[in-house]
Design a protein with these regions (language model features):
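Glycine-rich phosphate/nucleotide-binding loop
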Residues: 134-228
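Single conserved hydrophobic/aromatic residue that forms the stacking wall/gate
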Residues: 1-8, 12
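Buried hydrophobic positions in well-ordered alpha/beta secondary-structure cores of metabolic enzymes
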Residues: 9-10, 72, 144
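A glycine- and small-aliphatic-rich helix-loop capping segment at beta-alpha/alpha-beta transitions
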Residues: 22-30, 99-106, 160-170
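Glycine-rich phosphate/diphosphate-binding loop of Rossmann-like nucleotide-binding domains
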Residues: 34-38, 45-125
Length: 229
């Protein structure tokens, strides 16, 4: 099965990794400015607006990207599956290219030999090429994506090759900590209906998968074959 993965940040508004958006009211100049601790600035023109518009600023850190890369490589080794990683570095020559470079540097320095010994491969391609390949694939690999890409593509993969209810969601930290959850989240809409006394019907398969995945991992950690099988 194909397993898209996600990193932090990018266009998502989280407590630590926040994107910033501005509704432009009218004509004016938009700039991207970085101010170093010593006061020096790096300034780039985004756009000279002649009318109203919209601006979005996104960011990530090398530390976060490195942690994501380690988590992906370790998960691939743990599951003995090939790892694909895809961005659009031909267009995003700094932002996406930084992801590509960090993944490759970490792979070459720390994981190439381990992957070879495990009989699996690391493969990088452009996101549009990856989508075309995935739709024709039989599965059996991990597809690592940036945050937004993974959010969208995971639903596409689950719908094209089964259903959303059959999708699993596993949070993996670089230190090897695993957390299993139902991919659909808390189904808030159904819960509010339940509070009103209305009848609800929720597919429980994703919750079952979360429990069985966690039990299997616990079995691996405790070396209990009957549980980890």
């Amino acid at each position: 099965d194909v397993a898209p993965s996600r990193g932090l940040g990018d266009v998502y508004k989280r407590q630590v990794y926040k994107n910033t958006e501005i509704k432009v009211p009218g004509p004016g100049k938009a700039e991207l400015v970085f101010t170093a601790e010593d006061g020096t600035e790096i300034r780039e023109l985004i756009h000279n607006f002649t009318g109203s518009g919209i601006i979005q600023g996104i960011h990530n850190t090398d530390k976060s990207i490195s942690s994501f890369a380690h988590a992906c490589f370790k998960y691939a080794l743990d599951t003995k599956q090939d790892l694909w990683f895809a961005t659009k570095d031909t267009i995003s020559k700094k932002y996406d290219h930084n992801f590509k470079d960090i993944f490759q540097e970490i792979y070459d320095a720390e994981y190439a030999e381990q992957f070879k010994a495990a009989g699996i491969e690391y493969f990088y391609t452009l996101i549009d090429d990856a989508v075309a390949r995935v739709m024709k694939a039989k599965g059996g690999f991990i597809w690592a994506c940036k945050n937004y890409d993974g959010d969208v593509m995971s639903d596409m993969v689950s719908s094209a090759f089964g259903s959303l209810a059959m999708m699993t969601s596993v949070l993996v930290s670089p230190s090897g900590v695993y957390e299993y959850e139902a991919a659909h989240g808390t189904v808030q809409r159904h819960y509010y209906k339940y509070l009103k006394g209305e009848e609800t019907s929720t597919n429980s398969v994703a919750t079952i998968f979360a429990w069985t995945g966690a039990l299997r991992k616990r079995g691996e950690m405790d070396k209990l074959e009957a549980v980890s099988y």
